UniProtKB/Swiss-Prot annotation:
Cofactor note as given: Binds 1 [2Fe-2S] cluster per subunit.
Protein name: HTH-type transcriptional repressor NsrR
Species annotation: Photobacterium profundum (strain SS9)
Phylogenetic classification of the source organism: Bacteria, Pseudomonadati, Pseudomonadota, Gammaproteobacteria, Vibrionales
Keywords associated with the record: 2Fe-2S, DNA-binding, Iron, Iron-sulfur, Metal-binding, Repressor, Transcription, Transcription regulation
Top-rank taxon: Bacteria
One example of a Gene Ontology biological process annotation: negative regulation of DNA-templated transcription
Protein function: Nitric oxide-sensitive repressor of genes involved in protecting the cell against nitrosative stress. May require iron for activity.
Cofactors required: [2Fe-2S] cluster
Pfam families: Rrf2
Transmembrane segments: none
DNA-binding region per Swiss-Prot/TrEMBL record: 28-51
Binding site for [2Fe-2S] cluster: C91, C96, C102
Length: 144
């Protein structure tokens, strides 16, 4: 299963925000610079993550973005469910005439469930905790 770029960069943005000291603000421009993604695309992603409560957006001259909740409360499976269209194939009878007898849709549904179940085992914190190489790649201070 391949995630859309929206979900992919949404997760990456959350990873970056999780590396900031608690409460510290950064800019969308900084996140786009780190990942080399279009600012317009990242604005849409941050807007959605803000609506979902994962990102806190602060307006004004001294504004910016930061995590909207602690990283240990952000479950990866929840983020993917909220940002990813999870229909793997179109099994409507109007689209596929074998749908009434097809066993593939059940197998794919099980695979999707297993994929999400694995993501549910991990939080945003688990991606950054004790991961100095990640901090180096994100140009964040490494704490011993």
């Amino acid at each position: 299963m391949q995630l859309t770029s929206f979900t992919d960069y949404g997760l990456r943005a959350l990873i970056y925000l999780a590396t900031l000291p608690e409460g510290e603000l950064t800019s969308i421009s900084k996140v786009t610079e780190v990942y080399g993604v279009s600012r317009n695309h990242m604005v849409k992603i941050i807007n959605k993550l803000g609506q979902l409560g994962y990102v806190d957006t602060v307006r004004g001259k001294n504004g910016g973005i930061r995590l909207g909740m602690p990283a240990n409360r952000i479950i990866l499976g929840d983020v993917v469910r909220a940002t990813e269209p999870l229909q793997i194939v179109n099994c409507s009878e109007d689209f596929c005439h074998i749908t009434p007898a097809c066993q593939l849709k059940g197998i794919l549904a099980s695979a999707r469930s297993a994929f999400l179940a694995e993501l549910d085992k991990h939080t945003l914190l688990s991606l950054i905790d004790n991961n100095p190489p990640l901090l180096v790649l994100l140009d964040r201070p490494v704490t011993e």
